[in-house]
C-alpha cells in the first residue's frame, strides 16, 4: 500500500511538472493571430471567421480577417483572458488557444490531410498543433442535432440516456489518456472540452428525449413540447455533476465552458411556462392580458402554434418588475441547487450562475440593476468579476463635460 501511494504521488508530481499552463487570469487586451493561407484565391470566396468568446455573455463576437492577395492575414482579437477562440475556415471548424498581447502564427493549407492543415508557431504552439491531430478527441457533438443519435435514444429513459452520455465521455477520456505523444496540457484541455460537451447533452436530457420522440412520431415541435410538458427528470438526476471537472483550475481556457450551465439551470422540473405563470400570479394584468396568457398556455398544452407570440413578448417586457422578480427567484434557486449538489456555494459553476444572471441587463446595453449588483458582489472568480465590471462601466451613462 505504501509503495502504491508513493507511486501515485510521484505520478501526480510528474503530471504537475509536465503541465505548463497556469490558472487563467483576468487580462483585457488584444491577442494577435497572423498567418498565411496556401493557394489562396480571392475569387474562391473562402469562408473565414473568428469567434472571440465572452464567457459571461456565453457568446462570441464574430470577426472577419482581411486576407491579402498573397494569402497573408493579421487580426487583433479582443479577449478578457487567455482562452480558446473559434476559427472557421472553409470546412474546418476548430479552436485556437490565444493570450492577450501575445502573437500566434498559423500556416494554413486546407488541401493537406487532417492533422497537417494547420501549423502553429508562437504562443501555445505545442498545444495548438497537438489539438489538430486526429488521434486526440476534443469534442462531443450535441445529441439533439444528430438524426442517427436521436433514432437510437427514442423511447429510452432519462437515466439510460445519462448512462450513455457518461459512458461515452469516460471512453473518450480513457482514449485521450493513452495518447502519451501529446503534452499533459493538451490532453487536459481536450478532456475538459469533452467533459463540458457531455454536460451540455446531460442538461438537455429532457429536450433530447423530446426531440427523439418528435422525430420518431413525425410530429411538430409544438406537439412534442406538449407531449413532454408533464414529464420530469428524477429529483437526483443531476448528482453526476460532482464527478465532473467543473471547478478545474484550467477550465476557463476552454471555449465551451459555457456548456457547464445552460438555460435549464439543472432544474429537474424545468417549466417552459414559468414566466407566464409568475405574471398571472403577481403582475397587475388587465383582463385582456390575462386572456392572452391563458390563450398561450392553452396553445402550448395543445401543441399548436400560438399566433400572437409578438404580443406576448410585448406583455412580458411591459412588466419589468415582475419579470425581474421571476428571474431573481429562478437564479437564486439555481444557485442554491448547484451549491447543494457540489457542496460549495463559492465554486466556479455557482459563480458562473451568478455571472449569467447579469446577462439580461448587459445584453440590452443597460447597467446592472441593484439586484444584479448584489449577486455580482457574491462572485469570487477574478475573471467573471473583471468582465462584469468592465462591461458595466461601458453601460454607465456618460457624464456631461
PLM region descriptions:
Residues 1-25:
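Bacterial Sec-dependent N-terminal signal peptides
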Residues 3-4, 69-71, 323-330:
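N-terminal start-of-domain structural block
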Amino acid at each position: 500500500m505504501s509503495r502504491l501511494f508513493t507511486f501515485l504521488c510521484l505520478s501526480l508530481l510528474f503530471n504537475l511538472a509536465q503541465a505548463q499552463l497556469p490558472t487563467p487570469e483576468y487580462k483585457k487586451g488584444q491577442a494577435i493571430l497572423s498567418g498565411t493561407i496556401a493557394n489562396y484565391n480571392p475569387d474562391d470566396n473562402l469562408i473565414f471567421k473568428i469567434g472571440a468568446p465572452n464567457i459571461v455573455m456565453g457568446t462570441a463576437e464574430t470577426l472577419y480577417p482581411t486576407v491579402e492577395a498573397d494569402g497573408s492575414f493579421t487580426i487583433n482579437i479582443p479577449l478578457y483572458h487567455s482562452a480558446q477562440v473559434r476559427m472557421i475556415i472553409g470546412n474546418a471548424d476548430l479552436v485556437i488557444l490565444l493570450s492577450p498581447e501575445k502573437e500566434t502564427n498559423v500556416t494554413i493549407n486546407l488541401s493537406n490531410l487532417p492533422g497537417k492543415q494547420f501549423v502553429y508557431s508562437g504562443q501555445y504552439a505545442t498545444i495548438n498543433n497537438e489539438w489538430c491531430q486526429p488521434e486526440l478527441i476534443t469534442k462531443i457533438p450535441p445529441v439533439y442535432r444528430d438524426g442517427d443519435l436521436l433514432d437510437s435514444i427514442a423511447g429510452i429513459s432519462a437515466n439510460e440516456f445519462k448512462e450513455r452520455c457518461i459512458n461515452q465521455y469516460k471512453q473518450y477520456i480513457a482514449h485521450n489518456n493513452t495518447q502519451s505523444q501529446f503534452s499533459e496540457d493538451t490532453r487536459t484541455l481536450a478532456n475538459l472540452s469533452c467533459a463540458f460537451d457531455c454536460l451540455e447533452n446531460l442538461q438537455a436530457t429532457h429536450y433530447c428525449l423530446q426531440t427523439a420522440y418528435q422525430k420518431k412520431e413525425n410530429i411538430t415541435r409544438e406537439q412534442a413540447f406538449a407531449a413532454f410538458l408533464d414529464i420530469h427528470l428524477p429529483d437526483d438526476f443531476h448528482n453526476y455533476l460532482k464527478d465532473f471537472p467543473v471547478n478545474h483550475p484550467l477550465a476557463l481556457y476552454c471555449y465551451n465552458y459555457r456548456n457547464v450551465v445552460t438555460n435549464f439551470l439543472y432544474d429537474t422540473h424545468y417549466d417552459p411556462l414559468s414566466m407566464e405563470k409568475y405574471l398571472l400570479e403577481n403582475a397587475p394584468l388587465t383582463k385582456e392580458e390575462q386572456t392572452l396568457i391563458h390563450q398561450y398556455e392553452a396553445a402550448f398544452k395543445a401543441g399548436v402554434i400560438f399566433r400572437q407570440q409578438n404580443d406576448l413578448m410585448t406583455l412580458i417586457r411591459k412588466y419589468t418588475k415582475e419579470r425581474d422578480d421571476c428571474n431573481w427567484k429562478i437564479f437564486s434557486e439555481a444557485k442554491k441547487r448547484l451549491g447543494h449538489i457540489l457542496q460549495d456555494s463559492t465554486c466556479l459553476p455557482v459563480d458562473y450562475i451568478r455571472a449569467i444572471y447579469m446577462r439580461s441587463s448587459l445584453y440590452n446595453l443597460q447597467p446592472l440593476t441593484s439586484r444584479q449588483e448584489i449577486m455580482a458582489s457574491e462572485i469570487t472568480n477574478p475573471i467573471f468579476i473583471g468582465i462584469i465590471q468592465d462591461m458595466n462601466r461601458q453601460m454607465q451613462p456618460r457624464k456631461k463635460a
